[in-house]
């Protein structure tokens, strides 16, 4: 053995070729943490010092190669002063460069996935051979940063600027055949042949059949582009990528700038350029928010995994109520491999549900994401019915009938009589109390909420709601089923609106206040979209449905009269009374026309302003900053209350719920991280400036205490 550590070993194979093997003890995957980096330093030094070594193959002892840097460790480094962070980055890069500069040929054998630092390790090798099932990529831009272990330097010199920009700026994972096509790898082989193929490549290089020094040379030099070619390549790329990423996500454009700036330098100077840009991005609030999101998501997955021990296996599911929502739930279940009964009392409802599922599956086939055979398999997994005949075999039932407590209670009691005693029943209600609905059931311990968001196939969040009498098996099974459907479940406790709608309606409350002061809803939408929301509150109201918003507002006002009840009529009341229900009937705040693709397109409608005139109580001058504060303060404070009331267990879950459920701007990290970014004391002071607007703007006593003590929600 040439070197043995806890993450890396180097052992002789044959003919002077050694295997540098990554196999991090106690972990299911390999990652670059401090231990792995320090051992790589030692392993490279050991290889360099051993005159008998004639070649190196780099392998993994796990099912994947290396998933990248351990962000939980490296995020602490981002708090260091710029000079220290840059020095640390360059020190790590020296390890990869020293590996690249070994006198002997090096071959990386890529299995599973090689992402971020994992791919950068492979780029430092002379040759790369890849398993046909493996994927490679540089996903750092998704964390608000860019590759920091030489990725922006080596990749463009290997596969050309255009390809490298696409890989780095998109952050996507690339299949083996695509990597081979652009020249990122030298060979693709069947998984079982990977080790032998890597060894063969190394032998050929040792024998002089392959010139490893010639392969290495382009990575050490400047880019092979003249000044005009550089200008055309980089300026076009920056314009296109900036348009795609938008102004709130600087990392993709910064990556291109770094590649451009380093284009005329050799490797070592180019790595300094990369490090300087990396440090600049690491210090941005966007990077802190997106890394925070990543860590929150990891926490969510860990929590959801804990329920697996108690969860029952769901072999057959059912949905009550077809239509668009029921069809969406059936589609998602069948697509992910759980067959589902879809029951409705009307033939038209069943047809609508089947049409919805077929349409969604058809779109996947069109995009090449599903084979026609798999589409047929998924469609066969949806079994329409108008009776409870087969419900005796069902493991979980999702009730998705009309949002009316009496109707839901009647349907739930009916289905309870048709299923086996240990079947789980879940209601897809968005606002009705789970404990109230449970009163109609004989086995309330088997009942919980399972709130999907519309459209089901696009929205990742599922709220799993625990009622007063809900048992752990019901929660665990519902969480496991949601995960199996490809969703991100969050367990919340019962209250009006649960987590997401409880937080959303105060946001709409802020919108109502602005409208009552005569502020143009088109302006409000523009300001909030600029803030980072996918759509402004007027457009969102139209998409959700004014009638849905009207009903939800009444439920929330009843549940929280101290701050959500309103005096007199608001915008949603007059819109509802004028039968302007939003997209569903072609007129709401906006009017809707059908575009060439048959999709609704919003246009301003003077009639909407006439409808709103009676609710304007005064004309008030407000700045764009005021608009943001009117909207965001109530949303943030209600999120704080949900955490304090135990509706949601952790700050991470609260923030992820808003990002996955209502499209809270990811680069701002969630409502609680947004408060942290302003500063808790500063946020409390800001809210106090708007105190005259009512209780929605009044911080809680506990938040004031946090402000006084200098506390934060994260870190």
From Swiss-Prot:
CDD domains: crotonase-like (cd06558). GO terms for cellular component: fatty acid beta-oxidation multienzyme complex. Residues 312-715 are annotated as: 3-hydroxyacyl-CoA dehydrogenase. It comes from the Bacteria. One of its GO terms (biological process) is fatty acid beta-oxidation. The record marks 120, 140 as: Important for catalytic activity. NAD(+) binds at residues 325, 344, 401-403, 408, 430, 454. Pathway: Lipid metabolism; fatty acid beta-oxidation. The keyword Chaperone does not apply. This is Fatty acid oxidation complex subunit alpha. It comes from Pseudomonas aeruginosa (strain ATCC 15692 / DSM 22644 / CIP 104116 / JCM 14847 / LMG 12228 / 1C / PRS 101 / PAO1). The lineage of its organism: Bacteria, Pseudomonadati, Pseudomonadota, Gammaproteobacteria, Pseudomonadales. The gene is fadB.
């Amino acid at each position: 053995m040439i070197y043995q550590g806890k993450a890396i070993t180097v052992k002789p194979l044959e003919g002077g070729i050694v295997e540098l093997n990554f196999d991090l003890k106690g972990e299911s995957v390999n990652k670059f943490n401090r231990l792995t980096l320090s051992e790589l330093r030692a392993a490279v030094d050991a290889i360099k010092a051993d005159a008998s070594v004639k070649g190196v193959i780099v392998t993994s002892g796990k099912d994947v190669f290396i998933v990248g840097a351990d962000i939980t460790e490296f995020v602490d480094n981002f708090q260091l002063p710029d000079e220290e962070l840059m020095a640390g980055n360059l020190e790590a890069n020296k390890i990869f460069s020293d590996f690249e500069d070994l006198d002997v040929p090096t071959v990386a054998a890529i299995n599973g996935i090689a992402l971020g630092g994992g791919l950068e390790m492979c780029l430092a090798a002379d040759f790369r051979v890849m398993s046909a099932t493996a994927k490679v990529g540089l996903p750092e831009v998704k964390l608000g940063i860019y590759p920091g272990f030489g990725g922006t330097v080596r990749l463009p010199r290997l596969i050309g600027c255009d390809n490298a920009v696409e890989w780095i700026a998109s952050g996507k994972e690339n299949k083996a055949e695509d990597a081979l096509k652009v020249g990122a790898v030298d060979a693709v082989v069947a998984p079982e042949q990977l080790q032998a193929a890597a060894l063969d490549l190394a032998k050929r290089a040792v024998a002089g059949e392959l010139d490893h020094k010639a392969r290495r040379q382009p990575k050490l030099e400047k880019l092979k582009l003249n000044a005009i070619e550089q200008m055309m390549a980089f300026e076009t790329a920056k314009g296109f990528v900036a348009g795609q990423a938008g102004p709130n996500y600087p990392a993709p454009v910064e990556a291109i700038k770094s590649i451009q700036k380093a284009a005329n330098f050799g490797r070592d100077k180019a790595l300094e350029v990369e490090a300087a840009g990396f440090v600049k991005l690491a210090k941005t609030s966007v990077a802190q928010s997106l890394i925070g999101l990543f860590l929150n998501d990891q926490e969510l997955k860990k929590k959801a995994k804990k329920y697996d021990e108690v969860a029952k296996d769901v072999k057959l599911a059912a949905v009550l109520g077809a239509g668009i929502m029921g069809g969406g739930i059936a589609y998602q279940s069948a697509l992910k491999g759980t067959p589902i009964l879809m029951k409705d009392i009307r033939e038209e409802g069943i047809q609508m549900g089947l049409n919805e599922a077929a349409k969604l599956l058809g779109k996947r086939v069109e995009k090449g994401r599903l084979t026609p055979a798999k589409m047929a398999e998924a469609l066969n997994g949806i079994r329409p019915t108008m009776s409870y005949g087969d419900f005796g075999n069902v493991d979980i039932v999702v009730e998705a009938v009309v949002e009316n407590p009496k109707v839901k209670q009647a349907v739930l009691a009916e289905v309870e009589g048709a299923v086996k005693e240990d079947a789980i029943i879940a209601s897809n209600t968005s606002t009705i109390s789970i404990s109230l609905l449970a009163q109609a059931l004989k086995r309330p311990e088997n009942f919980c909420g399972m709130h999907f968001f519309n459209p089901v196939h696009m929205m990742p969040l599922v709220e799993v709601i625990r009622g007063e009498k809900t048992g752990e098996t019901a929660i665990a099974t519902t969480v496991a089923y949601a995960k199996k459907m490809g969703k991100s479940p969050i367990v919340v406790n019962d209250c009006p609106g649960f987590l997401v709608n409880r937080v959303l309606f105060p946001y709409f409350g802020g919108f109502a206040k602005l409208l009552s002061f005569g502020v143009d809803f088109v302006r409000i939408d523009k300001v909030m979209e600029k803030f980072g929301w996918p759509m402004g509150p007027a457009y969102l109201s139209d998409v959700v449905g004014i009638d849905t918003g009207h009903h939800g507002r009444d439920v929330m006002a009843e549940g929280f009269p101290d701050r959500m009840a309103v005096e007199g009529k608001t915008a949603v009341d007059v819109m509802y009374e004028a039968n302007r229900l939003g997209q569903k009937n072609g007129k709401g705040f906006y009017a809707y026309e059908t575009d060439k693709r048959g999709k609704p397109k919003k246009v301003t409608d003077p009639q909407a302003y006439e409808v709103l005139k009676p609710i304007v109580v005064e004309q008030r001058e407000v700045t764009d900053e005021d608009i943001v504060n009117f909207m965001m303060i109530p949303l943030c404070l209600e999120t704080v209350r949900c955490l304090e009331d135990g509706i949601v267990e952790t700050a991470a879950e609260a923030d992820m719920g808003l990002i996955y459920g209502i499209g809270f701007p990811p680069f701002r990290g969630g409502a609680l991280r947004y408060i942290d970014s302003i500063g808790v004391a500063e946020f409390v002071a800001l809210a106090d400036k708007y105190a005259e607007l009512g209780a929605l703007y009044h911080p809680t006593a506990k938040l004031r205490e946090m402000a006084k003590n200098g506390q934060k929600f994260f870190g």
